[in-house]
Amino acid sequence: MAVRPIRIVGDPVLHTATEPVPVGADGSLPADLADLITDMYDTMDAAHGVGLAANQIGVSKRVFVYDCADERKKTTRRRGVVINPVLETSEIPETMPDPEDDDEGCLSVPGESFPTGRADWARVTGLDADGTPITLEGTDLFARMLQHETGHLDGFLYLDRLIGRNARSAKKTVKSHGWGVPGLSWMPGEDPDPFGH
């Protein structure tokens, strides 16, 4: 299908909760959803991401794709799509995030990363591309991805979770790049890779 531009922090679609994907009485999904999911995979792959929410490409639908290892620096990955996800987590630590273990980035904040507090365990329930109910759960990096992508669909970026000096640093970084305004995007595969993959 197609690689689509990824919206950058400040675009209203990233800061607004997405709409659930309608499911028919027979469990059927909208006919155009398959093309959207294919475009999301293509875009995530071109950007070398571990996840991508639909609103990151400007579509306000409650769906995300992922291609993520369970732990950092592991090569075995899980790949799939979750439609209308519902998130459940363990308690989020109230301590300052560790600069190494809790570092998090985002394709909508290209090239930047900040320590972000997240729960150690997460579970998401939803539907797969065929409309079949699924449950995903994990710890470490996979749990972080589940929380990150579901947060996107709720209208939040990981920057919204930052505290203390990390929040101040992120605000300065966004301002220095000229982000935080509507209409900015980058094109995976055409623009330079902001994360250096």
Swiss-Prot record:
Its cofactor is Fe(2+). It holds the Pfam family Pep_deformylase. Binds 1 Fe(2+) ion. The active site is at residue 149. InterPro entries: Peptide_deformylase, Peptide_deformylase_sf. Belongs to the polypeptide deformylase family. Removes the formyl group from the N-terminal Met of newly synthesized proteins. Requires at least a dipeptide for an efficient rate of reaction. N-terminal L-methionine is a prerequisite for activity but the enzyme has broad specificity at other positions. This is Peptide deformylase. It comes from Mycolicibacterium vanbaalenii (strain DSM 7251 / JCM 13017 / BCRC 16820 / KCTC 9966 / NRRL B-24157 / PYR-1).
